[in-house]
């Protein structure tokens, strides 16, 4: 779960750690649906009680198409086009009994239970879901933590996710959170996630507080056995309840992600782990060899064995398990520089020796390669060299925890931590609830020491049901304009063709004739009630290809009456 860091840091600087709770209404969260925001069209299935602009109400199972066209939104429904301007709101109402009450988007199965606010941004449809906090969590908790997790772990996740959402409420913006890992993953409601729904229901409104403000309830998939400080991840000031501490539960969980590699102590071929790591290690050895008078050429020395191997130098102070290096103590086979002892010569002649012609550079001479008696120590950077060479990186972040253990004939290297490591570990919470029989309150107390739990009012009644009188009242008709005389159809039907009349619209309304058999296709003409047309072809999709006396196009079959 990544965070909007600039905003967090700015608020911390401005107000200190204890941020004031500024929102008075905790019942609604506004979610920018980024999964659907890069489209000029959004398909909406109505599976509940919804209305638009106090004009339209929809039967359960209705399909709408809302399209951005020339800076405006147009809603297509039952062959009708409604020009909504720059915004359209699908407003949810109370529905009878326990029937589902929400929307399905772009043909998906999950339910989006809220008011859908649609506007135009850069020519695209921008969807923002205004959803009750507890309903919002039904689309978050089972996607941040699997529905199969123990119920107390799911409850802890529900409290953390609720607290995160409430802390981010910001009436000055047009949305509070996005639906991806920049905030929290939100995917809508799947009725099969019964455990997550139970966890949300049994912790309704429970939120984490510290010094009178909503706490920073960060959470991570796995911390690798040690919680991380947000200062080490994002900078800023320390947070009293988010510190570095050992987490035995995360590391005990067999489902915590671990990547491993084996490095032989006495490689027969001089390879340390693999060829890539060997090249890195040998390159780091070259300066030492040259200083001690050994041939530094890579081809002339080899690694006989690894005497010791361990992680070294904490990256964030002595308590941190995130290390900078893997320190290796190595036995080498190398060539020592050859030295020659020359005795001085005395000439019996008094005449000076002739001047020697200048010679080129003298190439060093080397003894035969032999084992070096003194071990060499080299520090190999974990990030990126070791994790890349051994292919043990988990999430491409330079915050993973590397451990080295002695396995007899080899050293075993393991890498752990999936995510930023701050706050609640989902794998740790799973282990605590599953193997240690703890409550969600105890889980939260372990990961957020000093945080208090408080129950907030996070529910509001839905708008009253749409009245039966409103359901029976047709929407407003367009302002009457002089109706043109219908153009008579002079052409007679041929083989496989029929005469039809436009009957499925109001007497003073029109039916759109489209260029293609699609609700978003261009409108090429408007047909009036009672107008006679020639049906040329019946399509499987429910469309008809028709012809007037002047043009051909497509209409939905249910709006015409075919005369055979």
Predicted regions and their residues:
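Short alpha-helix capping/helix-loop boundary micro-motifs
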Residues: 517-522
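Short, cationic motifs built from Arg/Lys/His that form the positively charged side of catalytic pockets
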Residues: 512-515
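Short, exposed beta-strand-loop hairpins at the edges of beta-sheets
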Residues: 546-550
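Conserved, single-site charged/polar hotspot
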Residues: 2-510, 524-541, 551-555, 561-564
